[in-house]
Structures are given as structure tokens and as C-alpha cells.
């Protein structure tokens, strides 16, 4: 299998997960993050069985379970009487082969960042604000504000809701 040099714009949940999966497959990966340090804001996040299979593939299942919860069901009640009006089960682990879990977004981000850095301590390059990219005959060049460009075979845009990569593509 050919080894690719893969550039990832963004060190959020998607970028870190993609990086770890690609490194596990034997590729050279570099993540470029605009922030001066890694940190994730937000509240709770749900990890469905499908996503949990990916976390298991990365070997971080135990860390997720230690920091998260596995709710049994969603229960909807009337506010004034407490009467249950709807209930649906979330614990269908036997059916899907993995649990449904919930944890704090920052905890998931920390776990994913640790996993990526275990594979390559220098995988995340901070203070790299992406300004765009250029497709070349042999790959792609990722451009930054106040930094030299870098070249790779493949570019993954995981740079968030205000994605510079996506905006240039569409």
C-alpha cells in the first residue's frame, strides 16, 4: 500500500479522529490548527454505536467509558405530573455491538488528542491559520497566514463551521 502525506486543517474532533485512523493505516499525517493551544469548548456530546466502533478501532474504548456514561433510555415526562409520555431505549449494545455513550466534549477532545499524539508526538502544529490551498500536479499545497506553505498528497478540511477549505471548494 502506498503511504500518503496527508494534511489535515483543524484539530477538532473530526481532524483528530481522522488523523489517528490514517496514522494507524500507515500514512504520514500532519494536523494544522489555528489556535495557540488545544482546547475544546462545548457541552455534552453523544457517541453512537457507529462512532463507538471507530473509538474501539483506535483503542480508546476504555478511556471513553471511564469518562462517559451509558444511558439506558430517553424518558419524556409531563412537567406538571411527571407522567411518562414517551420512552425509548438507548442500551441496544447487543444489537449494534457497541454502546451508546455520552460524555463532555472537552473530555472526548482530550482523549482523541492524546491518542493522536501517542502515534506521533508532533502530529499537531499549532498557530497555523489556514488561508487556502492550491491543487498541484502532484498533490496539494496548504497556505497559511504568516507561515510558509506545506505540500502533501491529500488535504482533509476539518477546520470547523467556518471552514476555509470548504469555502474554497464550493
Put a short name on every predicted segment:
Residues 2-6, 48, 52-170:
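Conserved N-terminal helical subregion
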Residues 6-8, 29:
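Conserved hydrophobic helix-helix packing surfaces used for dimerization/oligomerization
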Residues 15-16:
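N-terminal Rossmann-fold NAD(P) dinucleotide-binding loop
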Amino acid at each position: 500500500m502506498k503511504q500518503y502525506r496527508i494534511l489535515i486543517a483543524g484539530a477538532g474532533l473530526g481532524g483528530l479522529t481522522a488523523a489517528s485512523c490514517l496514522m494507524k493505516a500507515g500514512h504520514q499525517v500532519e494536523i494544522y490548527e489555528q489556535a495557540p493551544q488545544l482546547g475544546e469548548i462545548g457541552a455534552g456530546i453523544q457517541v453512537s454505536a457507529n462512532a463507538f466502533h471507530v473509538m474501539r478501532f483506535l483503542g480508546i474504548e476504555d478511556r471513553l467509558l471511564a469518562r462517559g456514561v451509558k444511558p439506558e433510555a430517553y424518558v419524556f415526562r409531563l412537567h406538571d405530573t411527571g407522567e411518562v409520555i414517551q420512552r425509548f431505549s438507548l442500551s441496544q449494545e447487543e444489537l449494534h455491538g457497541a454502546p451508546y455513550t455520552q460524555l463532555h466534549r472537552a473530555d472526548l477532545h482530550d482523549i482523541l488528542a492524546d491518542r493522536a499524539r501517542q502515534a506521533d508526538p508532533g502530529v499537531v502544529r499549532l498557530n497555523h491559520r489556514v488561508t487556502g490551498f492550491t491543487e498541484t500536479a502532484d498533490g496539494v499545497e496548504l497556505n497559511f497566514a504568516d507561515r510558509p506553505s506545506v505540500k502533501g498528497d491529500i488535504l482533509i478540511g476539518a477546520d470547523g463551521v467556518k471552514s476555509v477549505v470548504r469555502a474554497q471548494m464550493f
